[in-house]
Amino acid sequence: MFEFMVTLSILAFGSLVGFLFGEFESDRVTQSFHSPKSKKLPHGKLLTARIIICLLVSCATLGYTRDTLLMTAVMMVSLTTTHRLIFNRGVGKPYWYMGPPLDHRDKDDSKYDTAMHLIASGLHLFNRKAPFWIAASLEAIAAVWLLYIFFTF
């Protein structure tokens, strides 16, 4: 039960952070994620936001110890890898893993129709103004923490 509550609190905290970051962008950023008109944060700000999210979640759950930096590093690698898999996946990658490539989907196709997007879609639908990359980052953080909690407790 404790593990479940910790996981929920991490997701809720991450969702709040995602909403706050989303408030600084245009209201229509996520209406059409694949649209050329959609605005994105510069790479430097995106990386900074990722680091802040990882540090906040690590400090909130582990306190200020050396394990905090270790978990932050693990989460950074995890969310960066997840982001690459979701958004920069080539046509040659297997469809069963991530669904059709994003640039080959029709307008009516959902961006969240694969198992890997379940957590991200929940956060994104809850916070309509939050950019999808935040939801993807939170998905990766949640995945790492679920593994961490599972093997720790």
Task: For the regions a language model picked out, list residue spans one by one.
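Catalytic phosphate/metal-binding cores of nucleic-acid and nucleotide-processing enzymes, i.e., regions
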Residues: 2-153
